[in-house]
Amino acid sequence: MSSINITESAQEHFAKLLAQQPEGTNIRVFVVNPGTQNAECGVSYCPPEAVEANDTELKFEKLSAYVDELSLPFLEDADIDYVTDKMGSQLTLKAPNAKMRKVADDAPLFERVEYAIQTQVNPQLAGHGGHVSLMEINDEGVAIVQFGGGCNGCSMVDVTLKEGIEKELLVQFEGELTAVKDLTEHDRGEHSYY
């Protein structure tokens, strides 16, 4: 069973919209290009005739959400909210597993660390046009990473590595990882963030 969370405010928002649609219309939550860096999540109306036999129906208090078979694993832990602030109201859809399928807790260490980097570290670095890739984990439990994009040549990369990435990964993989080291040659250039 998928664990998509639709907050109360989002359910109320959808219920208002659905009240203006033909009876029996619900919503569909989907991922286009799931499991890729170009993955995008969306929500659309789902009239009764659009429900497919292999869809999963997620029942909520005010509506049902239908998810196609392909999108389902990529929407694990997704959160749909309707937030209002001084700038107005907007629907937010956070799907941490849309670009990469969640790995099992007993998966090999490399896969679990790679998943953590892709879903937790890289989204933070993306704001600066950067990313990090896991190259290997050696016999001493040292994760070797390589920075790319705007991180390459950035003067803050050592701080990012030690205070951000290493700290986060060592807590998450306590007893399995001993350190995180940088393989990247940092040549400053026009692509560098700082």
Swiss-Prot record:
Binds 1 [4Fe-4S] cluster per subunit. The cluster is presumably bound at the interface of two monomers. [4Fe-4S] cluster binds at C151, C154. It comes from the Bacteria. InterPro entries: Fe/S_biogenesis_protein_NfuA, FeS_biogenesis, FSCA_dom_sf, HesB-like_dom_sf, NIF_FeS_clus_asmbl_NifU_C. GO terms for molecular function: 4 iron, 4 sulfur cluster binding; iron ion binding. Its cofactor is [4Fe-4S] cluster. It holds the Pfam family Fe-S_biosyn. One of its GO terms (biological process) is protein maturation. Gene3D superfamilies: Fe-S cluster assembly (FSCA), HesB-like domain. SUPFAM superfamilies: Fe-S cluster assembly (FSCA) domain-like, HesB-like domain. Keywords: 4Fe-4S, Iron, Iron-sulfur, Metal-binding. Disulfide bonds: none annotated. Belongs to the NfuA family. Homodimer. Involved in iron-sulfur cluster biogenesis. Binds a 4Fe-4S cluster, can transfer this cluster to apoproteins, and thereby intervenes in the maturation of Fe/S proteins. Could also act as a scaffold/chaperone for damaged Fe/S proteins. This is Fe/S biogenesis protein NfuA. It comes from Aliivibrio fischeri (strain ATCC 700601 / ES114). The lineage of its organism: Bacteria, Pseudomonadati, Pseudomonadota, Gammaproteobacteria, Vibrionales.
